[in-house]
């Protein structure tokens, strides 16, 4: 028996090469990038939370993280800061384009693509996210480039 007999790769979700966060602004790329991101829900999160109980941060699966961001974007009086930390090549830029497409609301078709992908990971999280969505000003910055934050914000 071979691995290929047990597992199948979803070629519809394959995106070749590294994703750049600023591709959120590229109309030719953003749809393919946002649609190809594969969210995982709490049932498929490969982290044992007991191992991380003594840390100051909580690890989240990507569907739960999307919900957390949608909730925070709806709040008006709290600190809405969230940080994503992960190693090189783990999909942070890909995730950022998908989340920006979801939260900005500038393109409803794009938002629905992302919601569909979240639904595959966890239908209940997708339904809850829907109650928090509205249009947001989303500014995506590529931290790998040397940039002046003030000029980047003014350019948007």
Predicted regions, residues:
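N-terminal pre-Walker A segment at the start of P-loop NTPase domains
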Residues: 34-75, 115-119
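Helicase P-loop NTPase motor core of nucleic-acid translocases
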Residues: 16-31, 56-59, 63-71, 82-87
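Short coil/loop residues immediately preceding or within conserved phosphate-binding loops
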Residues: 79
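Phosphate-binding glycine-rich loops and adjacent basic patches that engage nucleotide phosphates
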Residues: 7-20, 57-63, 111-124
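Context-gated lysine
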Residues: 8-13, 29, 43, 58, ...
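Extended, charged/polar low-complexity intrinsically disordered regions
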Residues: 1-52
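Charged/polar, solvent-exposed surface patches and flexible loops
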Residues: 5, 64, 68-71, 127, ...
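P-loop NTPase motor core
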Residues: 53, 57, 82-87, 94-156
